[in-house]
Swiss-Prot record:
Belongs to the herpesviridae US22 family. The gene is US23. Residues 460-481 have a biased composition (Acidic residues). It comes from Human cytomegalovirus (strain AD169) (HHV-5). It is found in: Virion tegument. The keyword S-adenosyl-L-methionine does not apply. This is Tegument protein US23.
């Protein structure tokens, strides 16, 4: 495999390393789906699913990845560790969970039982409950994801000693670090001995990144973007990390990649505290992703509880957010908050892949998921895009789609269309045309009957007077000045309306409430006030700096402190931390 030849040179990838390129083979996919077929078809009822679990006790089901992980079917009534646990307080939203059994690991020719309990929620969501930490881990969003990727997203897998290490090379450096991984001071000294060495930091299912070992925080000046930061800003970044951890800590190294110019581009920092708990510091923001996957510069959260877990899981907790626990416990451990999987209920498996007419036909869904043309060896990502294309091809090209129109009963004189394969053509109903209007119909308003005779007589008198004037042959009378309407008066209505509107605006201005200040006067700034504001801001920054320096020195020099006390500090003090500290890691202007 290429990652075992790291000393000969790292491979070059032309694609982004954020996608998950690893998945199971088609044979493994079918084996997992076949083992969980009974559970998949019983998901419509919780009682039926519980009966299935009771009827298949001690049956072993494959979990895909890792290849030696299995599920031993067992009801929840046989597990005493679940009797006093309220899982509704842990999960983000209320959801009914049904216990399926415990996870076991095949070692040589026998099974070793773990404490991990597998539960199923709505839509075949699978959760792992870890009693020692009282947390819920989202194992898979649905059964199809479990068959494709197994348990690679589950962080509890990497806490088991049977799980192999993903980070192995260079062998001498990794072996030396693991030897001193339980003592913080000894581990920091070991990192100093191998200062500048590159470790092939591998995450299961992801492409490898380079972990450059660094002795102290000041050595970051050799890496981008810290080499452009002044000494004061670098010290502020160090103080911010100390104020987040609330104890003494050490730097393990910087995670990133080498650029064409030869410089090392840093994306993350890996640090560990005095209790050998490992954390990640985000340096490069990732805002072009969905909200559950966004990462902001300056965020600090726990990556692993030990160095062994770190070299097994890598940056898995950076890429996924699937841990659910109590809020105080999450704040004490600096864990990343898990995303809510109940917001997109419309994106469930049977809504995205199947027709609405078969959304409860689980047997048909199972056959569709296990079809033979779903897997191809050249597919590097997953099958989601090909599933959408398959639906389009099956429904449009082949005509294999469900008829959801209600059958129409034939009326009198109607016959079924023979050219439509026995299906009745829909009848297009049109609105009736408007009624024709009679020619003799009078469209104008007719006056009242009482005034009809008066109007008729007046019209007759006018006609007679006009005939007399024509017979007399007199010259037409010129109009008087008072009878002439000038053009200005013809537009008088419009001008009057405009004048009234202008007068109305003036009256509104006069009726405005006095606000107590002059707008024109306030537009002129007093330079003394501006200088005073900047002086106050400078004094506040100076006070914040001195206060942070005193707190950091106190944390560094304390001799003994328990982990519980440090966690209590994080719960009580991190909420009042000034947001100005996190801005020290904002290097967006230095990233392209």
């Amino acid at each position: 495999m290429w990652r075992t030849r790291w000393e000969d040179g790292a491979p070059t990838f032309t694609r982004n390393d954020e996608f998950l390129y690893c998945h199971t083979r088609y044979e493994t996919f079918l084996r997992v789906m076949g083992d969980f077929q009974g559970i998949f078809e019983c998901q419509y009822s919780a009682d039926v699913l519980r009966d299935w679990v009771r009827n298949h006790v001690d049956q072993v089901l494959s979990l895909g990845i890792p290849h030696n992980w299995f599920l031993q079917v067992r009801p929840g009534s046989t597990m005493p560790e679940l009797r006093d646990q309220l899982l509704d307080d842990v999960i983000c939203c209320p959801e009914r969970l049904i216990v399926l059994g415990k996870c076991v690991i095949m070692v040589e020719d026998h099974y070793e039982e773990t404490e991990l309990v597998l539960c199923m929620g709505g839509g075949t969501r699978l959760y792992i409950y870890e009693p020692s930490q009282e947390i819920l881990l989202l194992c898979a969003r649905h059964l199809d994801e479990l068959a494709r990727y197994g348990m690679m997203y589950t962080e509890a897998v990497y806490r088991q000693p049977q799980t192999p290490f993903a980070t192995r090379v260079p062998h001498d450096v990794v072996a030396m670090l693991l030897r001193h991984g339980h003592d913080a001071d000894a581990l920091a000294a070991c990192v100093g001995e191998h200062h500048g060495r590159d470790v092939n930091f591998h995450t299961p299912g992801r492409h490898a990144k380079t972990l450059k070992l660094l002795t102290s925080f000041g050595c970051l000046t050799d890496c981008w973007p810290f080499e452009v930061a002044p000494a004061a800003r670098l010290a502020e970044c160090e103080m911010y990390v100390t104020l987040q951890l609330r104890c003494r800590w050490y730097l393990l190294g910087a995670v990133g990649s080498y650029r064409a110019g030869g410089f090392f581009d840093t994306s993350f920092l890996i640090i560990f505290d005095r209790f050998c708990r490992f954390y990640v510091v985000i340096v490069k923001s990732h805002l072009d992703r969905s909200p559950p996957l966004q990462r902001l510069a300056g965020e600090i959260y726990r990556l692993a509880d030990s160095l062994e877990e770190l070299f097994r899981a890598g940056l898995m907790k950076v890429y996924v957010r699937r841990r659910y626990e109590h809020g105080l416990r999450r704040a004490a451990r600096l864990e990343r908050n898990g995303g809510c999987v109940h917001m997109g209920e419309a994106a469930r498996l049977h809504f995205t892949m199947f027709d609405s007419g078969v959304d409860r036909d689980y047997a048909r869904q199972f056959r569709w998921l296990c079809r033979g043309d779903r897997f191809r060896a050249e597919m590097l990502n997953n099958w989601d895009g090909w599933d959408a294309f398959t639906i389009w091809q099956a429904r449009v090209v082949r005509g294999d789609f469900a008829e959801r129109r209600r059958p129409r009963s034939l009326g009198d004189g109607e016959e079924e269309d023979e050219g439509n394969d026995g299906r009745a053509m829909p009848v297009v109903r049109r609105r009736p045309p408007p009624m024709p209007r009679d020619d003799d119909e009078d469209n104008h308003v007719v006056p009242d009957n009482q005034n009809l005779e008066v109007i008729h007589d007046a019209l007759a008198d006018d006609e007679e007077q006009g005939e007399d004037d024509d017979d007399s042959g007199a010259e037409p009378m010129e109009p008087e000045e008072n009878n002439v309407v000038p053009n200005v008066e013809r537009r008088g209505g419009e001008d009057a309306v405009a004048a009234r509107m202008a007068a109305g605006h003036e009256s509104d201005d006069d009726e405005w409430e006095d606000l107590g200040f002059d707008l024109e006067e306030d537009t002129v700034f007093d330079l003394k006030d501006v200088d005073e504001w900047f002086e106050q801001r400078r004094l506040a920054e100076k006070e914040r700096w001195h206060l942070g320096q005193r707190i950091v020195n106190a944390y560094r020099t304390e001799a003994e402190v328990s982990e519980a006390e440090v966690e209590a500090r994080r719960i009580n003090l991190n909420t009042d931390l000034s947001p100005e500290w996190v801005k020290s890691f904002d290097f967006r202007e230095h990233f392209v």
